[in-house]
Structure formats: C-alpha cells, structure tokens
Amino acid sequence: MPAVDPVRLTADLVRCASVTPADEGALDILHDVLSDAGFDCAWADRGGIRNLFARWGRKGHPKTFGFNGHTDVVPIGNADDWSMPPFGAEVKDGIMYGRGTTDMKSGVAAFAAAAVDFVRDTPPDGAIVLAITGDEEGDATDGTTALLAYMAAQGEQMSACLVGEPTCPDRMGEMIKIGRRGSMTAWITFIGKQGHAAYPHRACNPLPALMRLMDRLASHKLDEGTEFFDPSTLAIVTVDTGNPATNVIPASCSGTVNIRFNDAHSGASLTEWIKTELSRIEGEFGVQIDLRIKISGESFLTPPGPLSALVSKAVKAQTGIEPVLSTTGGTSDARFVKDHCPVVEFGLVGQSMHQVDEHVKTDHIVELKAIYSRILTDYFA
C-alpha cells in the first residue's frame, strides 16, 4: 500500500460540502482509508450526526494514542464573495482554497495519513484511536460527547489524546494549546411598564436598569490572570429594545453578555456573581429581571508534562521552532476529551479559518503529517 498523500486526502474531504450537520460523504472517505489500512471502524451516530470511531491495535491497550478532530465546517456565506469555489479544493501557487482547508479537514487528513503509514511500516506495541465527529462547529451536543459515550460503552479508551485544531497564529509550529478558557453566555431581560415618553412617571423604563447593569458588569475586573491563563474577559454582545418609536418608553429590553473565563472561576461562581448584580439592580430600579445562562464549557488545563513535551519535541524537530504552550483562543472539543485523558492541541496556522477564501499552504499539510508521524514514533518508542 503506497503512502497516503495528505494533500490529496484533504482535497477529497474539502470537496464534501459538510456544513454542520451535513456530512456529504466526508466521513465515508475517511472510513474507507482507515478500514483499508486495517483499522477497526465503527459509527457512533447520535441525533442525526455522523461520528466515526477507528482503532488500530488491541481494544483497551494501556498504551493507546488518540486523535480527535472534526470534518464538519461552518457555512460559506455568499459564494460570490469567494475567488475560488468554496468546495473546489483548487490549488493555486501552492495554496489550496476551500471551506475546511484550515479548520480542520487538513488536520484530520494529516493525522490519518500519518497513522496509516505508521502502522504499515512500524506496527507499534499499542493502539491508535481516531475519534472524528461531524458536530463540532454546531451545538456540539452529538459529536465528540457521543464518541466518548460510545467508547465508554464499548470498553474503548485513550491514554493520551491530540486534537488537531489549527493552533498556530502566524507561523507553523509556534503554538500548542494545553488548555482552554471556559465560555458562558447570559441572556438578560428587563421588564418594566410601557408609557408615553412625555409622562415617564406613569411608566417604568427598563432601559436605565439595563444600562446600569451592563456598565457594572463590563467595568468589573474579573481577575488579573493566572499562571497559565490570560485575564478573563466579559463582552457585551447584544442590546435590544424592540422599540422603533421615539415617543414610547419600552415595556422591556434585553442584553446579552459573553464571558471567557480562566481557572480562577467556574461557570457556577460567575452565575452567582451575575445574580448578585441583578438583585441590586432590581432593588434600585424596581424592574423585573429574567436571566438565562448557558455554560458552553469550563476552563481546563493539562499541566505541562509528558504529553506536551512529546508534542513540543516533534514540532521543534520538524520546524526548528520551540512552540509556546498556550491556553488562548475559543473553545474546542478538547473540553470534552479532558475528562477522559490528558489532551493537548496542535495543528496548522489558523489565520483564514471561517473566512471567505479559507486556504492552506499544501507544504504545511505535508509538514503537519511529518510532525504527527514524529509524535507517533516517539510515543511508541
């Protein structure tokens, strides 16, 4: 069996218009590549989402290296804004264009290619697992969590896991993610009493309460940062009255805030802080306030240790760059994997992800396969 070309495999995956929750054949392509190489493959579908589990080697082996990734992508927006077909995987001047070229079909292709070649040429004393989902860019309720549930039910496990998200800001090899901030969103509705703007004493205007609360939340310094995390941030993301009239005091208004928090906080502690602030505002302004909270993920950290050292060594050997260990950025499915085993993330340069004309250097895909190959070689040495 010839070596798997990660560039060709990336192109095959990109040509599948797998906008969440659609798969459009992407995971079937991966299934065939892995099963042909001797991987035991199974489907862990849930809620209409396709998820692929693949393992080479003995089930439950104490030395099992795992990889987690996704083949679903975000919408393309207006296709007319693209200079290349968004699902064409066309290459120009050494650059492949298309949705998912960076985030993260190239990462999935690079690891699959590395794993297939590795078990063919140097079968390890151990096992390799790939857990690939079609639900990362959406609600992520039936993706990696479904795969982990399937693994638990089947007695499958991973000793360590690498997530192939694009982690490098500008240069290939410059950053490994060893944790992520938590994320939560608060939707807050203020209910007053509608009235004529000329007679404010006959109404109860909820807007001053909204403005006061938003000012209190946004001006509060949550923390100074911790050893491995930057300071937590709070962003006001929506404010709405639904009131186009200039002579009417609105009956209600609403605002939304998003908090990205480090390990000085939890979703529960921040929820209590917001509730305390709401109580003060209710007492001061006499309005009714409704609160809805969604915690998308808690902060987590895989402390520097054997796994981050393993990946750092491979990255430096291939690129000559000593990668920074970071916890910056948004959420990823590593937030689910961290409850199963130690997890870090490493992948391509992510500058164009989710953008029009998303693209990747084909040389970087080849280099990423080489890095992943080094990781496997060193892990099973």
Curated annotation (Swiss-Prot):
<keyword id="KW-0028">Amino-acid biosynthesis</keyword>
<keyword id="KW-0170">Cobalt</keyword>
<feature type="binding site">
    <location>
        <position position="103"/>
    </location>
    <ligand>
        <name>Zn(2+) 2</name>
    </ligand>
</feature>
<comment type="similarity">
    <text>Belongs to the peptidase M20A family. DapE subfamily.</text>
</comment>
<keyword id="KW-0457">Lysine biosynthesis</keyword>
<dbReference type="GO" id="GO:0009014">
    <property type="term" value="F:succinyl-diaminopimelate desuccinylase activity"/>
</dbReference>
<feature type="active site" description="Proton acceptor">
    <location>
        <position position="136"/>
    </location>
</feature>
<dbReference type="InterPro" id="IPR050072">
    <property type="entry name" value="Peptidase_M20A"/>
</dbReference>
<dbReference type="GO" id="GO:0008270">
    <property type="term" value="F:zinc ion binding"/>
</dbReference>
<feature type="binding site">
    <location>
        <position position="103"/>
    </location>
    <ligand>
        <name>Zn(2+) 1</name>
    </ligand>
</feature>
<feature type="active site">
    <location>
        <position position="72"/>
    </location>
</feature>
<dbReference type="InterPro" id="IPR002933">
    <property type="entry name" value="Peptidase_M20"/>
</dbReference>
<dbReference type="GO" id="GO:0008777">
    <property type="term" value="F:acetylornithine deacetylase activity"/>
</dbReference>
<protein>
    <recommendedName>
        <fullName>Succinyl-diaminopimelate desuccinylase</fullName>
        <ecNumber>3.5.1.18</ecNumber>
    </recommendedName>
</protein>
<keyword id="KW-0220">Diaminopimelate biosynthesis</keyword>
<dbReference type="GO" id="GO:0009089">
    <property type="term" value="P:lysine biosynthetic process via diaminopimelate"/>
</dbReference>
<feature type="binding site">
    <location>
        <position position="137"/>
    </location>
    <ligand>
        <name>Zn(2+) 2</name>
    </ligand>
</feature>
<dbReference type="Pfam" id="PF07687">
    <property type="entry name" value="M20_dimer"/>
</dbReference>
<keyword id="KW-0378">Hydrolase</keyword>
<dbReference type="InterPro" id="IPR036264">
    <property type="entry name" value="Bact_exopeptidase_dim_dom"/>
</dbReference>
<comment type="subunit">
    <text>Homodimer.</text>
</comment>
<keyword id="KW-0479">Metal-binding</keyword>
<dbReference type="Pfam" id="PF01546">
    <property type="entry name" value="Peptidase_M20"/>
</dbReference>
<comment type="function">
    <text>Catalyzes the hydrolysis of N-succinyl-L,L-diaminopimelic acid (SDAP), forming succinate and LL-2,6-diaminopimelate (DAP), an intermediate involved in the bacterial biosynthesis of lysine and meso-diaminopimelic acid, an essential component of bacterial cell walls.</text>
</comment>
<feature type="binding site">
    <location>
        <position position="70"/>
    </location>
    <ligand>
        <name>Zn(2+) 1</name>
    </ligand>
</feature>
<keyword id="KW-0862">Zinc</keyword>
<feature type="binding site">
    <location>
        <position position="165"/>
    </location>
    <ligand>
        <name>Zn(2+) 1</name>
    </ligand>
</feature>
<dbReference type="GO" id="GO:0006526">
    <property type="term" value="P:L-arginine biosynthetic process"/>
</dbReference>
<dbReference type="InterPro" id="IPR005941">
    <property type="entry name" value="DapE_proteobac"/>
</dbReference>
<dbReference type="InterPro" id="IPR001261">
    <property type="entry name" value="ArgE/DapE_CS"/>
</dbReference>
<dbReference type="GO" id="GO:0019877">
    <property type="term" value="P:diaminopimelate biosynthetic process"/>
</dbReference>
<feature type="binding site">
    <location>
        <position position="354"/>
    </location>
    <ligand>
        <name>Zn(2+) 2</name>
    </ligand>
</feature>
<dbReference type="InterPro" id="IPR011650">
    <property type="entry name" value="Peptidase_M20_dimer"/>
</dbReference>
<dbReference type="GO" id="GO:0050897">
    <property type="term" value="F:cobalt ion binding"/>
</dbReference>
<comment type="pathway">
    <text>Amino-acid biosynthesis; L-lysine biosynthesis via DAP pathway; LL-2,6-diaminopimelate from (S)-tetrahydrodipicolinate (succinylase route): step 3/3.</text>
</comment>
